[in-house]
Amino acid sequence: MKRIVHIAALLALCLLASCGTDREHLLKVYNWGDYIDEDLIPEFEQWYEEQTGETVKVVYQTFDINETMLSKIEKGHEDFDVVCPSDYIIQRMLNEGLLLPIDKDFGNTPNYIDANVSPYIKSVFTKIADGGIDANDYSVGYMWGTTGILYNAKYVDPEDARTWDVIRNPKYAGKIFIKDAARDVFCPINIFLHQNQLKAGEVTMDELMMDSSDESLEAFEAFMAQVKPLVAGWEADFGKEQMTQERGWLNFTWSGDAEWAMMEARDLGVDLRYEVPQEGSNVWFDGWVIPKYARNVKAASYFINFLCIPENAIRNMDFIGYVSTVTSAEILEAMSDDELEETVDVRYLFGDIEGADEAHLDPTLYPDASVIERCVMMRDWGEETPKLITTWSRVKGSNANAMTMVVIGLFFAVLLVLGIRKKFFSKRRRRHYRKK
């Protein structure tokens, strides 16, 4: 299917060229699969002409892992105009000089980027780059979330789920699924293993996110050696379905996947809940950037601005199932649910918008300020990254349980192809795989 999509995109380029469409009137977008409401694409083309008096045709292509996208730009010098990497790749591209600044002078068109992107997201983005560069000049946040524990309240004590130590609790042996994402697992566990140093003020959370020391990697590997016999599978995408079917009781996962699973589980009468453990965790972000080899920088900037219109952000959230970095009164109202008894303080995200201090929002998608206080953004390790990847390979090793779950995953894939599980596709609640 990916090959078909790629070929279709190339054919589209050839067809447009044969029809006399100049490159300056094309906008090449490179994004994750299922990561935008594609009805917005033709709407953008019309909106762009209304705003600028110029025509543009979007050529839309998708990738499945960050490294595929990065390689095409870094080594292949492909002329994508706007792409959507994850946080650590944005940092790497900035440090390697692969990004162009985003022009936010839109003339008579409102600057929706500066008006609507969360102040919290902007503050976090200032920490991405080295050398005093403000990443907000080169990137705009798109979606974000946390990493935590999804658990079945029927089998798992909620108190157990409040700590990362739950994944080595023998009570849940054979019922634990862990994301096959080295950085997303290492960083929270490294925080857990350094609790004494954190409490003593000997180290900060930000420092732990950049900790690639041999001592920490060895401690992580030793911890995971105790976890491995309890693990049913290392998963990139199928863990949430195992949770909804009660084949799994614990899932080390992303908030968006957790939300998808909880929605599906409600229909099945399964009580799934999500917790960001008390020791702390990481927040992840994806954002839009303009690569240095782009050939339609103007349309790229307008495209990013278009996606920051609250109505469009709401549509993307509804389609994708993740949380937009765009925050406004309209979004707060649209995402509120008065049936939720507990409220969350999301002033860190929405600023001084009325009602943000006691908002009736889903805490899985919109964590309370008290949760965010113990979360930090992951950073790129640069040349140290291979050390983590090597450690992670040893952690997983060869595992009969993991292989069993791969077989189960393939079985469900066949069912999907046959259309037996169309329900899961209809909601599009899937998170792309953030390879670390």
Where do the model's predicted regions map?
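C-terminal motif of bacterial Sec signal peptides marking the signal peptidase cleavage site
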Residues: 15-18
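Early extracytoplasmic/lumenal segment of secretory-pathway proteins
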Residues: 20-96, 397-405
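Hinge/lid segment of periplasmic solute-binding proteins
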Residues: 61, 67-70, 87, 91-144, ...
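Conserved C-terminal helix/tail region of periplasmic/extracytoplasmic solute-binding proteins
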Residues: 357-436
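Ligand-binding "clamshell"
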Residues: 94-102, 134-136, 261-276, 338-343
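Ligand-binding pocket segment of bilobal, Venus flytrap-like solute-binding proteins
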Residues: 175-178, 185, 189, 198-273
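Periplasmic-binding protein-like
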Residues: 110-112, 218-226, 268-292
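Mature extracytoplasmic/periplasmic domains
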Residues: 291-371, 432
